[in-house]
Amino acid sequence: PVGMDTLAVEGCLARLEKEMDLVVLPVFYYGAASFAVAQPERNGSIHVDSAVLRAMAEQMFAGLLRVGFRNLHFFIHHQSENFAAGMPTDLAFKFAARRATFAFLEETRGDGWWGDPAMANYYEAHAEGSDPFSWIQGHPLMDAEILAAYPFDHAGQGETSLMMALYPDTVAMDRHSDEQWYAASAVDASAELGEQGVEMILAHMRRVLG
């Protein structure tokens, strides 16, 4: 379905929220989708340039830091098979997080904040994930461990199975076509496989959220 990349994140967080004490912000549906798969006309893709995303995300992160949040996490599924190297959407949010954190530290602690004796434990804090640059962390919905065990695709078996498990009413297999090579494996999708994927994702989320 349209919006699958966001629905997958939203659906998994909805389940996780029932067992963890979380503040879940409204989902953000727009990203640097590109039109690499198909033209947008009569299809539905909306592309937002990564520079615009970065500016928006930076303002949002800056506001959350001022409110007092120090344990912020965002999850991205779109094009996240390249999350380590980065793709336009996740790079925009990662860069925004760094810029917002730097600006906040400079505003609240002043010049020389990193060289201050109070930061003498910076490298130890960084190793354990408690330094200021760990206040905002980005994650792929599926980490490398999941990618090794669950099919990652575009509207294929893996993604269709996730939707069958999380939002079954959004799946219309009668509209499946063999014309799209990337969606050919969707005929093998099942809610059972999707539930396996969801459980792996939830385990991943529990690990990174602590």
Regions found by a protein language model. Give the residues of each.
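Extended, histidine- and acidic-residue-enriched regions that form the cofactor-binding/catalytic faces
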Residues: 1-210
